[in-house]
């Protein structure tokens, strides 16, 4: 897909005025402002360092209105400065006179970070492009830049003003993170070799069902291995008794749980034998080990997959040619219920297959086990990752493609 849009290799960006849209939306301590996970900051250092001879203006967002971590980006600018070892000037507005004056007076090598784009209602209009391009954000900022580098992969599924609003203003260029994400995800989707597997676990049932449908319908994978709450939903859909507390958790956290269970049932019927579920579990708080044929008490929750399931999954993983992994097998944060996740993740890490992982809990677990570097790629995306792998229309990528059609004949690149 990379040839469909501009990349940073297509232009000489030295000395140019660059609008750089990234996504450093990160876990933040709402009381102290401390950045609790800097993985996205580090992921963007390559793009920023490559633009060291340009005049770079960084735009990003943090959380959303109403959340306790909906904060200014002042601390983010300071944190990024420490990572790239270069001063980033913070401007506490997005398009004020002060912001425009600061941008207009930049020298090559300067970096500015503007205020949280979601402080402005125009960012989340959910409107058509004609409306978006006439916002104050676009009208006031667009004349200030030569190029627009769009590198916010984790937000590609959102048609927000600072992401797609400049597609008619000049060349919109995929940044290095965007380019790498798409390259690696496409590599998995179109990888030749069998068997290909997806490990879908954790608690996000709707996302996993969505990906499962796309992966199986388009024969992107041969098998799906389930764990966590995702497995519980498929087990219930398959007619198994998962216990009262486990079903209550599904109902409480999914308003559309009936629709999700129906979808899971249809997938099991349509793709028989290709969605694999646990055969045994560890239960909390009792610590009991039970097989799927045994009863689960009303006060017990499924906290981990059991040893039989680990053995069954391991045999499939060891033969895989390519693996996509999203979600832990159980409550991995509690040591006694982390065994399934640890065993499966370690087996994945040691296989020679193409290995790609995504999702916040997955990456946290991999980091805690010091396994991240053993994988071929770990994605920064959450909802964006799911939407991309599911084959959905992606507003930001669509905008990049349309922009190249608009400006491809006007710019001959380097």
Swiss-Prot record:
Keywords: ATP-binding, Cytoplasm, Glycolysis, Kinase, Nucleotide-binding, Transferase. One of its GO terms (biological process) is gluconeogenesis. It catalyses: (2R)-3-phosphoglycerate + ATP = (2R)-3-phospho-glyceroyl phosphate + ADP. ATP binds at residues 333, 359-362. HAMAP family: Phosphoglyc_kinase. Belongs to the phosphoglycerate kinase family. Monomer. This is Phosphoglycerate kinase. It comes from Picrophilus torridus (strain ATCC 700027 / DSM 9790 / JCM 10055 / NBRC 100828 / KAW 2/3). The gene is pgk.
């Amino acid at each position: 897909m990379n040839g469909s849009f501009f990349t940073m290799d297509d232009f000489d960006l030295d000395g140019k005025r660059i609008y750089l849209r990234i996504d450093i939306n990160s876990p933040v301590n709402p009381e102290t402002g401390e950045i609790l996970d800097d993985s996205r900051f580090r992921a963007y250092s390559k793009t920023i360092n490559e633009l060291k001879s340009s005049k770079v203006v960084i735009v990003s967002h943090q959380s959303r209105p109403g959340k306790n971590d909906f904060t200014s980006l002042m601390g983010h600018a300071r944190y990024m400065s420490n990572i790239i070892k270069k001063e980033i000037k913070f401007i506490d507005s997005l398009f004020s006179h002060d912001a425009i004056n600061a941008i207009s007076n930049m020298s090559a090598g300067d970096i500015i970070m503007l205020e949280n784009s979601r402080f402005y209602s125009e960012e989340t209009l959910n409107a058509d492009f004609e409306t978006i391009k006439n916002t104050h954000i676009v009208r006031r900022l667009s004349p200030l830049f030569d190029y627009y580098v769009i590198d916010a992969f984790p937000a590609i599924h959102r048609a927000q003003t600072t992401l797609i609003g400049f597609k008619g203003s000049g060349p919109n260029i995929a940044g290095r993170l965007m380019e790498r994400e798409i390259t690696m995800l496409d590599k998995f989707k179109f990888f030749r070799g069998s068997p290909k597997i997806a490990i879908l676990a954790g608690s996000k049932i709707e996302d996993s069902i969505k990906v499962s449908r796309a992966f199986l319908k388009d024969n992107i994978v041969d098998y799906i291995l389930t764990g966590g709450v995702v497995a519980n939903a498929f087990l219930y859909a398959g007619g198994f008794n998962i216990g009262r507390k486990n079903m209550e958790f599904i109902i409480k956290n999914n308003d559309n749980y009936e629709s999700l269970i129906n979808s899971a049932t249809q997938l099991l019927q349509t793709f028989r034998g290709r969605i694999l579920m646990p055969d045994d579990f560890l239960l909390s708080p009792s610590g009991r080990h039970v097989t799927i044929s045994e009863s689960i008490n009303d006060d017990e929750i499924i906290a981990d997959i059991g040893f039989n399931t680990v053995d069954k999954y391991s045999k499939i993983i060891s033969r895989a040619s390519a693996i996509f992994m999203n979600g832990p097998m159980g409550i991995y944060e509690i040591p006694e219920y982390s065994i399934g996740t640890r065993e499966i993740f370690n087996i994945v890490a040691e296989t020679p297959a193409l290995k790609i992982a995504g999702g916040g809990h997955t990456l946290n677990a991999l980091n805690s086990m010091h396994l991240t570097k053993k994988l071929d790629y770990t994605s920064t995306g959450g909802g964006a990752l799911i939407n991309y792998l599911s084959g959905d229309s992606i507003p930001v990528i669509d905008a990049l493609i349309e922009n190249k059609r608009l400006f491809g004949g006007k710019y001959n690149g380097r």
